[in-house]
Amino acid sequence: MHYRRLGHSGLFVSELCLGTMTFGGSDDMWGHIGKLQQEEADGLLKTALDAGINFIDTANIYATGKSEEILGHALKNLGVPREDVVIATKVHGPMGEGPNARGSSRGHILDQAKASLKRLQLDHIDLYQIHGFDPATPIEETLEALDTLVRQGLVRYLGLSNWAAWQIVKAVGITQARHLAPIVSLQAYYTLAGRDLEREVVPALLSEGVGLMVWSPLAGGFLSGKYDREGTTAEGRRVTFDFPPIDKDRAYDAIEVMRNIAAEKGCTVPQVALAWLLHQRVVSSVIVGAKRVDQLTDNIGATEIQLSEEDLTALDAVTKLPEEYPGWMIERQGEYRAHLMQER
């Protein structure tokens, strides 16, 4: 297992992060994702820790708090030293019926941070992330609330999730202008089956020194090796929960190339998908969730896969985004003086 800086911070995290969205679901949306209870969660966490994973991600909304509770108990059950793990959680989603029981207002953030700490049985959160953009709350209010948590010692680092490029850059600018605790990470959807992030968000992250944590790297299981143009196995998650949306024809093209690469390297299709992400400069960590230990073990094997330039070119040929304005115009006009930068 290798460790990478989270953005431009001094925090180093494992290149794979254990996702816990499969913890604690019942007969609702979360149950379609996973219903792991304590003993199963303990087993997954132990497997992750034994492999060198030090980064674990959850959210207050996952199974309406149950995921955090199970993770907290798992850390205790395994006797994990606090300094050995980086615990990330998120706030934004609805945790009650009222209008103030959701979103990114100061009150909701401060209340939910304390609630998450209680469920996790911790005295601080290593990375606290705003789970989505709240159009009803000024960005300044959100960032001031996060800064308060850092100054109180309840939170160490701050991140965002599912924000647009302009929102991220604006937030970074506000923290700099007001001398607030900085934004060090973005958690976002990025995969060979969906590279939309590359248009605006990836350049913004590289420009501002914000690290990328990837969620759903296998496109909701579509790149798990269970799917092809001939159909799917009955255990595929998308049979009951078809999310995130993808262009399936393009994804099938990618799967065909991935199968060839996997056959040549003696690895699996999901390992190729994860390895491709680990070859992307913007990525700090890739979040991998699982329902079984063998799935997690297979994902961990991706850290040993080296893709050649030929492999990367073949994958790019079937998954790259079509050119759109203003991207193609920026590239064209940038050529006027690009050679001057190359000569330095």
Task: Give a label for each model feature.
Residues 27-28, 33, 94-196, 200:
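Glycine/proline-rich, positively charged
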Residues 1-85, 151:
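N-terminal binding-site loop/beta-alpha segment at the start of enzyme catalytic domains
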Residues 13-17, 54-55, 84-88, 124-127, ...:
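Structural preference for beta-strand elements that scaffold enzyme active sites
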